[in-house]
Amino acid sequence: MKFLVLVAFVGVTVAFPISDEDDDKIVGGYSCARSAAPYQVSLNSGYHFCGGSLISSQWVLSAAHCYKSSIQVKLGEYNLAAQDGSEQTISSSKVIRHSGYNANTLNNDIMLIKLSKAATLNSYVNTVPLPTSCVTAGTTCLISGWGNTLSSGSLYPDVLQCLNAPVLSSSQCSSAYPGRITSNMICIGYLNGGKDSCQGDSGGPVVCNGQLQGIVSWGIGCAQKGYPGVYTKVCNYVSWIKTTMSSN
């Protein structure tokens, strides 16, 4: 589930960003409208490996499991295989993982990237607001990314993919992943399967009612029945985000 690669290992589901051999997209979604997600960024290291969200002109929010010490951030991207004229590529000056990030449990799977210069904001590159409160179950959210579009096999569209999916209740989430869901995680998607984020979507945005409520984190497979995507619960980190940005 989500914008990452997921591998079941010793009973634990672990999320990985994609490698240069493995790109990814959303399963069961649709091609986004050209400026549907101007906050969406592509994290690059010679290839797209994760997504992220522009939250100010100089800061991007992503998943801690996407960490690299140096990252090229591509903003205004839509078709990865074409130059649309709207792209901005800015290198990172700082990459800051949450100090409580646990690579085994994926608790606190959140990371800030400071850009080496401010992005130029326009209709194709813009920020997404942080949450003013936590999202409620049943709310429909927009997930986007360049991840795998197949739940079995690989098909990698170049155009940004979108998916509308509901927030599940905490009880539904915990029942799907017994003993694995912390208070810093939310489940979003369909228990019947068929629609989900997937490998390569990791770190990307979940926007609900115009606010950034989730970060693609982990799951078992992609779009598998009974296993919705698991996302970092951004509303728990607003203070950490603001404090980290102001002190760096």
Swiss-Prot record:
Its EC number is 3.4.21.4. Its cofactor is Ca(2+). It catalyses: Preferential cleavage: Arg-|-Xaa, Lys-|-Xaa. The keyword Phosphoprotein does not apply. Residues 1-15 form the signal peptide. It is found in: Secreted, Extracellular space. The record marks 196 as: Required for specificity. SUPFAM superfamilies: Trypsin-like serine proteases (SSF50494). GO terms for biological process: digestion; proteolysis. GO terms for molecular function: metal ion binding; serine-type endopeptidase activity. SMART domains: Tryp_SPc. Keywords: Calcium, Digestion, Disulfide bond, Hydrolase, Metal-binding, Protease, Secreted, Serine protease, Signal, Zymogen. Binds 1 Ca(2+) ion per subunit. It comes from the Eukaryota. The active site is at 65 (charge relay system), 109 (charge relay system), 202 (charge relay system). Residues 16-25 form a propeptide. Residues 26-246 form the Peptidase S1 domain. Disulfide bonds join 32-162, 50-66, 134-235, 141-208, 173-187, 198-222. Ca(2+) binds at residues 77, 79, 87. Belongs to the peptidase S1 family. This is Trypsin I-P1. The lineage of its organism: Eukaryota, Metazoa, Chordata, Craniata, Vertebrata.
